């Protein structure tokens, strides 16, 4: 259940009843867009679980995706320490920017964002890849073949490490990560299932 922000905790007077809001992808952490909410917009956002802004251009409430259907489903809402801005984590449908970009902020993809994008792309190719797609055909050949490739790449990674060949170590490690992601997808798992497990382990004493 979505944890709601208490309206009395917000310093509405400080922001002239127009609260700045940053929208962030709940998995990748990528900043998607920025907007404003009045009290009515925040109330609807919390009640419906879909981001609704107050559009200063349209002079009305505006639900992101009301035309494109690229809605932003809320997973968490956080109020900043000065009680005058919101950070909303979302599960986006499609691309957020009206110019057909993932984010309204066009910045170079950070390394961790790339891993998220790669994970999503490989997951997509499992179901919708072309016949000449290596990823699609791996899934077509079944989990045993994928597992075999993971084992092969793991051995080759170990050999390159023992031989102290850094270039090959990077290349083989890349192959290993790729095939491991494909293997996870074959069981309807993904990168974030592994991250969740690693976070849980990190909280335990070693």
Curated annotation (Swiss-Prot):
Q: Where in the cell is it found?
A: Cytoplasm
The biological pathway it contributes to is:
Amino-acid biosynthesis; L-histidine biosynthesis; L-histidine from 5-phospho-alpha-D-ribose 1-diphosphate: step 2/9; Amino-acid biosynthesis; L-histidine biosynthesis; L-histidine from 5-phospho-alpha-D-ribose 1-diphosphate: step 3/9
> Which cellular component terms (GO) are annotated to the entry?
cytoplasm
Q: Name one GO molecular function term.
A: phosphoribosyl-ATP diphosphatase activity
Catalyses: 1-(5-phospho-beta-D-ribosyl)-ATP + H2O = 1-(5-phospho-beta-D-ribosyl)-5'-AMP + diphosphate + H(+); 1-(5-phospho-beta-D-ribosyl)-5'-AMP + H2O = 1-(5-phospho-beta-D-ribosyl)-5-[(5-phospho-beta-D-ribosylamino)methylideneamino]imidazole-4-carboxamide
Gene3D superfamilies registered for this protein in UniProt: MazG-like, Phosphoribosyl-AMP cyclohydrolase
What InterPro entries does this protein map onto? His_synth_HisIE, HisE, PRib-ATP_PPHydrolase-like, PRib_AMP_CycHydrolase_dom, PRib_AMP_CycHydrolase_sf
Q: Which GO terms describe its biological process?
A: L-histidine biosynthetic process
Region annotation Phosphoribosyl-AMP cyclohydrolase: where it falls in the sequence: 1-114
Q: What's the EC number here? A: 3.5.4.19, 3.6.1.31
The UniProt keywords, alphabetically, are: Amino-acid biosynthesis, ATP-binding, Cytoplasm, Histidine biosynthesis, Hydrolase, Multifunctional enzyme, Nucleotide-binding
| EC class name | hydrolase
Taken from the record, one Pfam family name reads PRA-PH
- Region: Phosphoribosyl-ATP pyrophosphohydrolase, residue numbers: 115-206
Q: Superkingdom of this entry's organism?
A: Bacteria
For this chain, the family text in UniProt reads:
In the N-terminal section; belongs to the PRA-CH family.
Among HAMAP family, the record links this protein to: HisIE
PANTHER family, A to Z? HISTIDINE BIOSYNTHESIS BIFUNCTIONAL PROTEIN, HISTIDINE BIOSYNTHESIS BIFUNCTIONAL PROTEIN HISIE
Its protein name is Histidine biosynthesis bifunctional protein HisIE
